[in-house]
Amino acid sequence: MTLLSLFKNTNNNNPHTLIWGGDDFLNDYLANSYIKEDQFKDLEHVSVDCENDGLDELIASLTESSLFSENKLILIKNPFFLTAKVPKKLKKQMDDLQKIFDNLNELEDVVVIVASYDKLDRRKKLTKTVLKQFNVVEPTIRSYEVGVVVKSLIKAEGYTITQSALQLLIERSDQVIDTILSNYQKLKMAASDNKITEKSVMQNVDLSLAQNIFAILEAALNKNYQ
């Protein structure tokens, strides 16, 4: 099981993938897991940040051959070209990207886009093309789904966690998925035989801010009544 399979995929047989949602930490976590899959281990991995590197660098990565292997895996971050915030001076680059994504099936490389935006400009032709040509994954997690998703994610990565440990992890993370994943990283490093126990959570995950405040208030109240 892959982590992306925990969420709705529009075409999970298509390696070209768009991970789209407002949670950048979760998106990056899923993307990093995906590109490390065995099917991509022989590809040269290239990462392009559109905001820092620019669209010319992206186009070059998409059109130039790899120097180190037959094919590449191109990870695209901050793809502002899918939003409404594209300067008019970049029209040529937008046209070039349109041609590339129109003919994505001819591209021997694998393209993974991480779009950490709440909204994309669906009116734009380029956005429509990407949504059509890519396997689109929207990793949204409702509050009541946190426990099930986290447990499934942990299982997919080859770890086990007791129900009491899972509940404690969620509580100490204030039920925030980014914090849960961050704390889970600590637990993986400390896990013996890939097993996460309640004792491990207590030893490696601090009380949440809310729990600390509650403990301070409780201690103060107890002191007043003594």
Q: Which role fits each region the language model picked out?
A:
Residues 2-8, 14, 25-222:
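Non-catalytic interfacial helical region
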Residues 19:
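Hydrophobic anchor at the beta1->P-loop junction of P-loop NTPases
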Residues 22:
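P-loop (Walker A) phosphate-binding loop of NTP-binding proteins
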